[in-house]
Amino acid sequence: MTAIIDIHAREILDSRGNPTVEVDVLLEDGSFGRAAVPSGASTGAHEAVELRDGDKARYLGKGVTKAVTAVNSDIAECILGLDAEDQRDIDLAMIELDGTENKSRLGANAILGTSLAVAKAAADARGLPLYSYVGGVSAHVLPVPMMNIINGGEHADNPIDFQEFMIMPVGAPSLAEAVRWGAEVFHTLKKGLHEKGLATAVGDEGGFAPNLASTRDALDFVMASIEKAGFKPGEDMMLALDCAATEFFKNGKYEISGEGLSLSPDAMADYLAALCDAYPIISIEDGMGEDDFEGWAALTAKVGKRVQLVGDDLFVTNPKRLEMGIGKGLANSLLVKVNQIGSLTETLEAVSIAQRNGYTAVMSHRSGETEDATIADLAVATNCGQIKTGSLARSDRLAKYNQLIRIEEELGVSARYAGKTAFGRLGA
């Protein structure tokens, strides 16, 4: 009854107006699943390959008809008739069919869209929400949001080199209240920027990209907004950074050009440690370049016992990269982006490896998103306790927050907001 009888992919647009892949899966009993694939702006060199057409005459080379064709032909032929509840077998069959280390033949976008649509169809067949189908009875922890309210780096045209300045409402009693707190800080920040004559247009992820002078200038604005909104920094709200340091790691130096700094890996670790001393920063993502293992080791040694150090470009949601990093003692947390690895099975494996080794996990969106809210369900399914899905603007970001609000309501008395427990042994 849960055999796959039809698969259909199409080209749709993401939140940046670029093409992406959407896949529909239909089962014998009429159950249905649909999934759309996100896309990143700052991508790690070790990510699985997002297959693009390269035809400059169409969508400026960013079309995905090759990936769509791969789903509708090769992948469909491979998995039609298989049982949608055999997720691992289906994912492994697609990976084997692709035959490359980085999914470059069929495309991670083709494989992932199919993988997630299969899971949704199987959940529909069981009459279960996706978080419950994937996570079982233990799926009841609502994640603390990392809300990206000021943008720099690759996400903005301003002098700030760090990519994201985020707030985390760790003191909220529930997910719904956490969203409210975040929204109130967001609107307070907007008012404060406007009063200073600074830009309040929003970027790809819904955050502001004002022309601020430095990292500390941005952090000061965020701190002031938290306080003006009536919350206590360090108690109600913690701060989080995504440095995206790979983007400004040049010839062995961290070129923080907006501040006129050229730092060695050790000096960069000291720079970040000083920020953690001055502000209530609980999490730093990609504080070092993706292959600067010595820098990561230095940063982990300096602040790893008190700050969550999240590997995004470092680990690219890849179980092999993650195991390498764990073995070297790099970072203490995994950023989870389903399209970095390209299948649900491998994503769940990476989260499991992280959690078994005492690393936290943070479910994450990409800068190019759609209305698909799958990652909200996966955050609850994996009990990872944290989610990074943008600011409090743009419906492609709010779709995830709204889905989490629904899940919390649906879980009722069994729902638990992770709050200050989200950081494992670090605490907040």
Curated annotation (Swiss-Prot):
Any Gene Ontology biological process: glycolytic process
Taxonomy, superkingdom: Bacteria
Pfam families linked: Enolase_C (PF00113), Enolase_N (PF03952)
Keywords: Cytoplasm, Glycolysis, Lyase, Magnesium, Metal-binding, Secreted
Molecular-function annotations in GO: magnesium ion binding; phosphopyruvate hydratase activity
Residues annotated to bind Mg(2+): 242, 285, 312
EC code: 4.2.1.11
PROSITE patterns: ENOLASE
SMART domains assigned to the protein according to its UniProt record, in alphabetical order: Enolase_C, Enolase_N
Chain sites annotated for binding (2R)-2-phosphoglycerate: 163, 337, 366-367, 388
Tagged with keyword Nuclease: no
Cofactor: record remark: Binds a second Mg(2+) ion via substrate during catalysis.
Record's GO cellular component terms: cell surface; extracellular region; phosphopyruvate hydratase complex
Subcellular location, record wording: Cytoplasm; Secreted; Cell surface
Pathway: Carbohydrate degradation; glycolysis; pyruvate from D-glyceraldehyde 3-phosphate: step 4/5
Record InterPro entries: Enolase, Enolase-like_C_sf, Enolase-like_N, Enolase_C, Enolase_CS, Enolase_N
Gene3D superfamilies associated with the record: Enolase-like C-terminal domain (3.20.20.120), Enolase-like, N-terminal domain (3.30.390.10)
Enzymatic reactions: (2R)-2-phosphoglycerate = phosphoenolpyruvate + H2O
CC cofactor: Mg(2+)
Cross-referenced PANTHER family: ENOLASE (PTHR11902:SF1)
Summary of the function given for this chain in its UniProt record: Catalyzes the reversible conversion of 2-phosphoglycerate (2-PG) into phosphoenolpyruvate (PEP). It is essential for the degradation of carbohydrates via glycolysis.
Similarity section: Belongs to the enolase family.
Identification of the protein by name: Enolase
